[in-house]
Regions:
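C-terminal catalytic/acceptor-binding lobe
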Residues: 178-266, 270, 446-505
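A conserved acidic beta->alpha catalytic loop
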Residues: 36-43, 307-315
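Short, acidic, metal-binding catalytic loop of nucleotide-sugar glycosyltransferases
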Residues: 22-30, 293-301
């Protein structure tokens, strides 16, 4: 059995503090260390009376300095960190620390996901903790981390992550996971802070971030920035074979392996502006005709169909219906066709749709009209379809919108079709950026372009399920891993532009 040190964060609630100390002594720890501000005489007397080791913090000390001093002073093989604002029974604490004191685990986390009810909306903290574990390829940890008290660490873990780990606890959690320490998160103690239990008014949407939330967000971004610096801009997530090489070559010389010029019309409904419709396709012979017929209803100057990896009649059907055809025999990878279509487009308004299901002309018109009226990126407003439990793809979309302080966009994203874009926005962010939709969205936001969710179109029910991409027996399917990677790539760019990459640290 390993020896135990318990470190208590001081409490303003003196009675609960004393009760907590008495419960903790029943665990037979080597010591109890408590952080006490030197102007809180009553707390000092309680700690002294109960034979605690006291770490005094003067008014110039930071919370982190007090924590570091406590960790350095600890003598036990295991360190248990508790918040004395909550009364925890001896029996609860004994069960909680059992895996680490019996050497079955190196780290014990509070299973807070037990208290985040399925029917409730997770707040910003929960979203970002979930995202951290996704980035670390540990989705099984859900939102559980050392950001929630209580938690317990073997002393050797603390030595490896550094005694000053509280200065960047986000990065510390990431290092714990990366270093392969054995983590147990099977026991739940209900000691959630107000921030952790706070419910948002809507599902993954809020009007604005508070100053406190912005400060927390900065800490998450700084932690992730160091991780990106260590692991690369996609931190190991696949891009599922996107042909970035083809995009690069087209940037140097616009030449397609196969090209057919189609026809269109000069529109009279966009105040003199002209519309290009871009449709990337692969083996969509059963649906492409209806897709094009609906697109014709909104008066496009051109419909550009980018065919890649097809072995059916998709290209011939689209050609018969007057579309401009760009054809590649090989698969280009997700979103590369969008980028190539944008390169070829000549319109003032660009509408992006998919070829595997049709969207009515009346629905499409909401997006093109919004851009005609001055919006630069008109997104599909998917918030009405959100219901708990939330899918990880919706969570990462919301996470990115939080990162650049646009929480009202919810899960609005260039990942989803339909969406439309202004010519000026495309020229500013670059057509090639569209191969990573989330990166394109970040660039547009940072450049000051108007990005709004304008209309709801259900793209879940009609979307064709591709088993190899959308289904997995273990973990996330390939499509989800690619989307997470795209969002991490977008975060990488955002962090670099905000100069939060930590390179000066």
């Amino acid at each position: 059995m390993k020896s135990l040190t318990v470190i208590i964060l001081y409490s303003e609630r003196e009675q609960i503090l004393e009760e907590s100390i008495q419960s903790i002594w029943k665990l037979n720890p080597l010591e109890i260390i408590i952080l006490v501000p030197n102007d809180r005489r009553n707390l000092y007397e309680i700690a002294k009376k109960n034979k605690c080791h006291i770490v005094l913090m003067d008014k110039y000390s930071t919370y982190y300095e007090g924590y570091e001093a406590s960790v350095k002073a600890a003598k036990g093989d295991v360190l248990l960190f508790v918040d004395s604002n909550f009364s925890i029974s001896t029996n609860e604490m004994k069960k909680f620390i059992e895996p680490v004191v019996t050497n079955q685990a190196d780290v014990v986390l509070n299973k807070i996901d037990k208290f985040v009810e399925v029917g409730k909306c997770p707040n910003m903290d929960i979203v970002w903790r979930k995202m951290l574990n996704e980035i670390l390829s540990r989705p099984d940890l859900k939102s559980n981390s050392i950001l929630s008290l209580p938690y317990a660490l073997a002393k050797e873990v603390v030595v490896n992550i550094g005694f000053d780990y509280m200065k960047n606890i986000v990065l510390a959690h990431m290092n714990i996971v990366d270093q392969g320490w054995r983590i147990n998160d099977q026991y739940a103690i209900k000691t959630l802070s107000r921030d952790e239990t706070l419910e948002e008014e809507g599902y993954l949407v809020k009007k604005e971030l508070s100053e406190n939330e912005k400060e927390k967000l900065g800490k998450y971004l700084i932690g992730i920035s160091k991780w990106i610096e260590k692991k690369g801009k996609r931190v190991g997530f696949t891009d599922a074979g996107k042909r970035r090489d083809i995009v690069q070559k087209l940037g140097e010389c616009k030449r397609y392996p196969s090209y057919h010029q189609g026809w269109g019309m000069h529109s009279s409904i966009y105040d003199g502006k002209q519309l290009s419709v871009i449709i990337p396709v692969q083996n969509e012979e059963e649906t492409i005709e209806q897709v094009i017929l609906e697109a014709r209803k909104i008066e496009p100057l051109e419909i550009i169909v980018v065919v890649n990896g097809s072995i059916d009649q998709t290209a011939n059907i689209a050609k018969r219906l007057g579309a401009t055809i760009i054809k590649y025999n090989e698969r280009l990878g997700h979103n590369v066709g969008r980028a190539i279509g944008a390169l070829e487009a000549t319109g003032d308004i660009l509408l992006f749709i998919d070829g595997d299901f049709s969207v009515s002309g009346s629905d499409l018109h909401h997006f093109t009209k919004a851009v005609s009226d001055g919006i630069d990126i008109a997104l599909n407003d998917l918030n009405p379809m959100l219901n708990p439990p939330f899918y990880i793809v919706d969570i990462v979309k919301y996470m990115l919108n939080l990162a650049y302080d646009r929480p009202e966009l919810s899960n609005g994203s260039l990942v989803a079709i339909p969406h439309a874009m202004s010519r000026s926005c495309l020229d500013a962010i670059g057509w090639e950026t569209l191969l990573c939709p989330s990166l394109a969205q970040v660039k547009a936001i940072l450049e000051g372009y108007r990005v709004e969710c304008v209309h709801y179109v259900d793209v879940v029910k009609p979307n064709r399920i591709r088993l190899k991409e959308n289904v997995s027996q273990n973990g996330h399917p390939p499509a989800v891993l690619r989307i997470i990677g795209d969002h991490v790539e977008a975060l990488s760019y955002l962090i670099e532009q905000l100069e939060m990459d930590g390179k000066g640290d």
